[in-house]
Curated annotation (Swiss-Prot):
It comes from Neisseria gonorrhoeae (strain ATCC 700825 / FA 1090). Keywords: Amino-acid biosynthesis, ATP-binding, Cytoplasm, Glycosyltransferase, Histidine biosynthesis, Nucleotide-binding, Transferase. Its main location: cytoplasm. This is ATP phosphoribosyltransferase. Pathway: Amino-acid biosynthesis; L-histidine biosynthesis; L-histidine from 5-phospho-alpha-D-ribose 1-diphosphate: step 1/9. CDD domains: PBP2_HisGs. It is found in: Cytoplasm. The gene is hisG. Its EC number is 2.4.2.17. Belongs to the ATP phosphoribosyltransferase family. Short subfamily. The lineage of its organism: Bacteria, Pseudomonadati, Pseudomonadota, Betaproteobacteria, Neisseriales.
Length: 221
């Protein structure tokens, strides 16, 4: 990467949409909408700043290895896949949700999750799930899925799921209920440590702008 250029790693969807006001606070505007473009590299109103659109789980990897100078990553991704080797200066307080355990309505989770019991857990967060239940002394068989998590308890694939919950509407629509909170999730600014040194003059104003925008947002709530 050039010393006078910045590459920002972002994922499509909610994180991108909620990052736009932060980018605007730093005077950065994408030239295209990722949801409407097939391009994976998108320019901005600054010739030396570009966005790379990657999977949410890949953002820390792009930043850690220097393919991007900084990015926005969910706490769930940082916990599950590791945030080592990254500078994490800000909790941006965006894309907020909760990591929860959910079961079919009527399932006696309290009795089934006593120390020494065994549960089948479907999730795309095996590390988080395993750590949580190990802390409770519960034995688990982890079944890794990549989507439609709510289906697993309904067809007998699992006793419970571990997944992100925002409104809870999807759980309710499928006859499930959240029964245990694991961790609150939001998205963080993650910065490549080498870039922070070599591109400090470019990065620091953006970090400060992001921080100011986060504080201003909560000042009005």
């Amino acid at each position: 990467m050039q010393d006078n250029a910045l590459t920002i790693a972002l994922s499509k969807g909610r994180i991108f949409e909620e990052t736009l006001p932060l980018l605007a606070a730093a005077g950065i505007a994408p030239t295209e909408e990722p949801e409407k473009s097939r391009k994976l590299i998108i320019g901005t109103n600054h010739e030396n700043i570009r966005l790379v659109i990657v999977r949410a789980t890949d953002v820390p990897t792009y930043v850690r290895y220097g393919a991007a100078d900084f990015g926005i990553a969910g706490k769930d991704v940082l916990i599950e896949h590791g945030g080592t080797g990254l500078y994490r200066p800000l909790d941006l307080e965006i894309a907020k949700c909760r990591m929860m355990v959910a079961v079919r309505k009527g399932f006696d989770y309290e009795a089934a999750s006593q120390p020494g019991c065994r549960l089948k857990i479907a999730t795309k967060y095996p590390e988080i799930a395993a750590s949580h239940f190990a802390g409770k002394g519960v034995h688990v068989d982890i079944i890794k899925l990549y989507g439609s998590m709510e289906l697993a308890p309904l067809v007998g694939l699992s006793d419970a799921i571990v997944d992100l919950v925002s409104t809870g509407n999807t759980l309710k629509a499928n006859g499930l209920e959240a029964v245990e909170h694991i961790v609150d999730i939001s998205s963080y600014l993650v910065v490549n440590k080498a870039a922070l040194k070599t591109k400090y003059a470019l990065l620091e104003p953006i970090i400060q702008s992001f921080g100011g925008a986060v504080k201003a947002k909560w000042a009005f709530i």
